[in-house]
Amino acid sequence: MTTLNVARVYLRVSSEDQDLQRQEAIIGNARESGYYVAAVYREKASGARSDRPELLRMIEDLQPGEVVIAEKIDRISRLPLVEAEKLVDAIRAKGARLAVPGIVDLSQLTEASRGVAKVVLQGVQDMLLRVALQIARDDFEDRRERQRQGIDLAKGAGRYAGRKPDTKMHERVIALKSGGCSIAETARLAGVSVSQVKRVWAQNQTKDKV
């Protein structure tokens, strides 16, 4: 009897002006590898946030035996290690596993092993994952520090004008919320976090009162 390998694909970029197109090839690659792609979750939000609507929806949708596929581990998380491990635990708690390039998957060997060998293989798998998650976080911190240094230099030279607001995202959030969508539904449809919806909506309400 043939076993159906089911995958859920998670695609993420950090901001609204970035394009997910480059990651779309993952879907075709997964199918060519023999996976049935149950759903694709596309998100434009920082990997350093844990309240990403599409990520949370994917975890909610996961079924036992399914596989989460992403381009790299930093697409799943750039969170601090403790929070990142909680995120991975939430995926594993649904009976699913990660399939991400750069991380050796020992799950099948672990399942087939017994006793000490099983414990050792599981320990190695967890260690490799922790290292990858920490590298993803370190890269995020390094980028943020370089950005801060660049801003400081630009301010010193009188060239820094501040970050421009994402007007398209703001307009989409306001339109959805004004149309009667809840905060959570607006976040999901707009592909942003709940906190972003609250902030944009609060700014809009304040502006209307002025």
Curated annotation (Swiss-Prot):
DNA-binding residues (ranges): 191-210
InterPro entries according to UniProt: Recombinase_CS, Resolv_N, Resolvase-like_N_sf, Resolvase_HTH_dom, SSR_resolvase
UniProt domain Resolvase/invertase-type recombinase catalytic: residue ranges: 6-150
Record-level GO BP terms: DNA integration
Disulfide bond sites: none
Entry superkingdom: Bacteria
GO molecular function: DNA binding; DNA strand exchange activity
Active site: S14 (o-(5'-phospho-dna)-serine intermediate)
Keyword terms, alphabetized: DNA integration, DNA recombination, DNA-binding, Plasmid
PROSITE patterns, per database record: RECOMBINASES_1 (PS00397), RECOMBINASES_2 (PS00398), RECOMBINASES_3 (PS51736)
Gene3D superfamilies according to UniProt: Resolvase, N-terminal catalytic domain
SMART domains (alphabetical): Resolvase
Function: Site-specific recombination protein.
PANTHER family: DNA-INVERTASE FROM LAMBDOID PROPHAGE (PTHR30461), RESOLVASE-RELATED (PTHR30461:SF25)
Family to which the UniProt record says this protein belongs: Belongs to the site-specific recombinase resolvase family.
The protein, known as: Resolvase
High-level lineage: Bacteria, Pseudomonadati, Pseudomonadota, Gammaproteobacteria, Pseudomonadales
Gene from which this protein is expressed: stbA
